[in-house]
């Protein structure tokens, strides 16, 4: 028995040694795995730190990369020349072949069959339009150019040729320059568009400056009229109703002008209209009174002022959201505003810009239009962004001696079209549109206080859904080259670039 036990012990010793070796190997593997994981984490951390440093150093802030996605220009707002003008024709030709190939490859891969069909039809219409133009059939050529533009509004060749037609045949150099700009934005290597812009840029800048000087003269003429003038007081009262009527109408309110006036004067409900439509009118009334009583006299506009303005706009419609930044992502047609996490820093930058020397050095109309665009682009609220932006714009204009500008609800499509163009990189058409509305509003006041018959367009009008500005648009006092200067798409700027009654 003792010998058997000894043999068993001798056999167990090798087995125990093998188990110890296996345990040691497992421990080594575990140690290696831990070391490997640590090394991976360390490398990943270094890469993350390097990326973070690169982003913050290039943008100046943690949110710089996100701000670039929602870029709001902070310099050279109305510069008529762009970065393409600094390149020579030879430099552009140097990378033209590569650029054209990359663009055609990317566009060709993304175009649908319907879009390809539209482009083919547009190019056919474009060729026919040029033939009509060369044979002197200008009316047919104009319709064909507009048809081509409607089919392919982003095609550089269509934009270029239509711009040339507008410049040389229609003498509409402002709109032609706008199309050259769009063609260059889509295809920077388009040397013809570049050459055309280099020719038109100075002329367009001069026309814009003359237009602003004309607005200043009309503002000064209006300022010279004594406040006690009874006609001026009547015009201001009627314009007040008009301003609220059109501003809520742009957002879809169906109240007529007479109903809007009734709600404001009597505070009585109108049969067949929703509570929200009543409350939108009352909110605008509160906001306008706040502007007249407080903001117009202030030297600086703060975020608190903007929030107070918005709180009154939504005070009757949505008092919970009124005066509060949105807390969720919103989508506005094809525009995706910044996320809620970026609103604080964007609005702080907006406030800084509003009160900066740079912005205050701009012409008041340019300044007000840009403030409107910047605020509506950020879209800081769940609702009421458009109304608040228009109210802020008018606050800035009133501080400069201008009356509150009326944007007619019948021009809603143009208004949104110019905002869309601004999102695409060209703010000038929107600024010109605001200048148009400013001039028409000034003309209404001057007309009302003149010795001419007191049938005031837009201040005394029928309740039709037709053209509110029909009488104004039948008269133009603009330079020929400036006619329809802020046109939109097909139709070449209907309803814009025209001035009011003499």
Swiss-Prot record:
- Molecular function via GO: AMPylase activity; ATP binding; Hsp70 protein binding; protein adenylylhydrolase activity; protein homodimerization activity
Q: Residues that bind ATP, according to the entry?
A: 251, 332-335, 383-390, 415-416, 423
Q: Which stretches of sequence are listed as region Disordered?
A: 1-24, 478-502
Query: How does the UniProt record describe the way this protein sits in the membrane?
Result: Single-pass membrane protein
What segments bear the compositional bias annotation Low complexity?
15-24
Spell out where the chain crosses the membrane.
38-60
Locate the Fido domain: which residues?
Answer: 301-436
Q: Name one Pfam family in it.
A: TPR_14
Domain comment, as recorded: The fido domain mediates the adenylyltransferase activity.
Say which family it is in: Belongs to the fic family.
This chain's protein is named Protein adenylyltransferase Fic
